[in-house]
Amino acid sequence: MGYQHNRSFNKATGAGFIIAMGIVYGDIGTSPLYTMESIVQGQGGLERISETSIIGALSLIIWTLTLITTVKYVWIALKADNNHEGGVFSLFTLVRKYAKWLIIPAMIGGAALLSDGALTPAVTVTSAIEGLRSIPAFHEAFGQQQLPIVIITLAILAILFLIQRFGTSIVGKVFGPVMFIWFSFLGITGLINLFGDFSVLQAINPYWAIHLLLSPENKAGIFVLGSVFLATTGAEALYSDLGHVGRGNIHVSWPFVKVCIILSYCGQAAWLLQNRGKSLGDINPFFAVLPQSLIIFSVVLATLAAIIASQALISGSFTLVSEAIRLKLLPRLKINYPGETFGQLYIPAVNLGLWLAASFIVVYFQSSAHMEAAYGLAITVTMLMTTILLTVYLAQHQKVKKVFVVLFFGAFIFIEGLFFAASAVKFLHGGYVVVILAALILFVMAIWHKSDQLFYKYLKSSNLNDYKEQMNKLRKDESYDLYHTNVVYLTAKMDKEWIDRSILYSILDKRPKKAEVYWFVKVNVTDEPYTSEYEVDMLGTDFIVCVNLYLGFHMRQEIPRYLRTIVTNLMESGRLPQQHQPYSIIPGRKVGDFRFILLEEKLINARQMPAFERFVLQTKEQIKKITASPARWFGLHFSEVTVETVPLVLSDVRNLEIHERISKENEVENLSK
């Protein structure tokens, strides 16, 4: 992960081709499992669907994959990489300097994409397991009962989410080959069934797509687009996974994937033309086109593909949340790094949330047909938000004519707007579940972003230069015991010599902390994903060190590891005196002990604040109670840490007036004096 050079990033290799199969195309590659089924049901079933509807629906699928996936994402969006990283948050970091309001589409798009992460595993695994009904022995035993399907699906999801904590590097090695077999299977079976009726190839003509939308034979009307959109739901994931495989591998592998997917849809359409008008009950064209001898193999392969698609989405959700945390759009959560692969991470809270949400969706909706009614709504929102951000990027970063930018924005806002309108009807048929989930995530993002702004608004700063003399006297004062050799404060606000006043309150007022060196460290998250740099300002002393760490939004914020390097560099350059330790298991140790002090600002005198600001800050305090501690987030769990609570000093809060009550005896006594 993390291509370091443009040459390797744009280069395509055989290994990269196979890896892309497993990482990038899982979601879009499992769409043939349920897209045609949803379209057939929307047209009244197999016995009522018309030839125009079949050809038109196939045409809509082909051109949706072409315009949205190929043109927008593969040709255009992949060029909008942030140091080889893609996705809605990476795109946001490229354009946020141009307008503050761009945070809004970024948050909406991110929240919608995360909510979709709960629905995709549920619908893909359920669709695959429902293929068991095509096996005679299974059908004879359970018939159309949905309970066995639900139980098997829940078991697979449980195993899938439970193994996340162990890392997926070993399993990931087989993802690519399995998905290559899956796409080959789609292409071959689709081609074989295509021989049954080559007339479906006329769907390549976009006339049939437009004709269906306007045709009275289309029983679903414009809402047929809600089912058609299922064919391209994985396009956004394709962009998000850019950093995992590189642009070159996606450019080379997508034509193969697209051909195989379209052949599968063509084969299903040909079978539908041959069997339309028949009363076969609720059937899934994907499994119906296969001979009985291949059913068991296809169910197993489809289940593996569904698991891989789910795994890719789960891993993508971990990455998305970690980016949002570092961009200060979500609270800090515990992040583990279970694998040896760079960038592989595991977030227990997100994993548990996705597992519970996916399991609830399976139990609540029962069948994939009902889940499909809710599927796609969130992704249309994410795609619209990506279009807005991408338009700003094209206007500012690319040497393209303004007319192209206008055409791009107009065309895709119109196309995706139609899909959104068609999918909006899903709200009443289950889409509200995803909308509620997305709204909750967006609420937390909005609270976190706004509270961060308010924090800087109310936090007071002081100039370190005004307190250097006091700090120097304190470190030499024999009446105080040495608190620690090095005292380190992590601060969210430091501009040159100006720092958070609460830190000086902690050093000088709360309990004078005598130390040889005072460290003030601020972590600055850069727009580049893999930055690892620092700046040091010692304010003309050898006992005050102001450190600005510049870390990319993909980098771990493990302060002690970076600090060890900085201390060594400062001592080797002579800027910091060596701290010889007489007692140590390390011979000749030159670095003393460290104590990290974390300050927790608590809101005081909240009644003096505007009601909305008070609500935001108080809500943040409640959310922080269930999130990861700063000590764990900054990699301090093996260090000596002190957590102090200090008041959030508000600039507009006045002291409360109070008058002394004087008794008559005291009043007479005072008068006599």
Swiss-Prot record:
Keyword field contains Transmembrane helix: yes
Primary localization: membrane
Compartment annotation: Cell membrane
Gene Ontology CC, one term: plasma membrane
Membrane-protein topology: Multi-pass membrane protein
A molecular function (GO) term: potassium ion transmembrane transporter activity
UniProt cross-references to InterPro entries, sorted A to Z: K+_transporter, K_trans_C, K_trans_N, Kup
Keywords: Cell membrane, Ion transport, Membrane, Potassium, Potassium transport, Symport, Transmembrane, Transmembrane helix, Transport
The reaction(s) this protein catalyses: K(+)(in) + H(+)(in) = K(+)(out) + H(+)(out)
Pfam families per UniProt: K_trans (PF02705), K_trans_C (PF22776)
Residue ranges of the TM segments: 14-34, 58-78, 101-121, 147-167, 175-195, 196-216, 220-240, 252-272, 294-314, 345-365, 374-394, 403-423, 427-447
Function of the molecule: Transport of potassium into the cell. Likely operates as a K(+):H(+) symporter.
Family: Belongs to the HAK/KUP transporter (TC 2.A.72) family.
Identification of the protein by name: Putative potassium transport system protein Kup 1
Lineage of source species: Bacteria, Bacillati, Bacillota, Bacilli, Lactobacillales
